[in-house]
Amino acid sequence: MGLSDQEWQHVLTIWGKVESDLAGHGHQVLMRLFQDHPETLDRFEKFKGLKTPDQMKGSEDLKKHGVTVLTQLGKILKQKGNHESELKPLAQTHATKHKIPVKYLEFISEAIIKVIAEKHASSFGADSQAAMKKALELFRNDMASKYKEFGFQG
């Protein structure tokens, strides 16, 4: 299920655009996640009080966490599938401490695709979208495998 060199090129090219504004992209991704899937808010103690889009827009903590999420994902994507050393500690905290279900990783992947498509429509065509979806699926599958190693069925 690996990606071809060309697919990784698509992923990393669009990711460069994401990295040009990690705070903006990350904030929008988390807002989209929480608006589309409000049940995910239950996993974030410090964000539970954010009920409206305006509250989410005004949250510096949400913006900071968005940067953290996309920074970590960027490190993983740049490894082009050889991400064991980056993925293992992330999977461990998400499995044992935060208890984030794999389904929620699917939800955030959808949010990432939607936000990139909205912000970079002209650069995120069908080939780039397909490659990014495939890269995020690889990430989720590898997270799910690691979850099992840590005894979390997610």
From Swiss-Prot:
Signal peptide range in chain numbering: none
PROSITE patterns found in the cross-reference section: GLOBIN
Residues that, per the record, bind nitrite: 65
GO BP of this protein: removal of superoxide radicals
Cited InterPro entries: Globin, Globin-like_sf, Myoglobin
Binding site for O2: 65
Transmembrane segments: none
Subunit structure: Monomeric.
Protein name (Swiss-Prot/TrEMBL): Myoglobin
Gene: MB
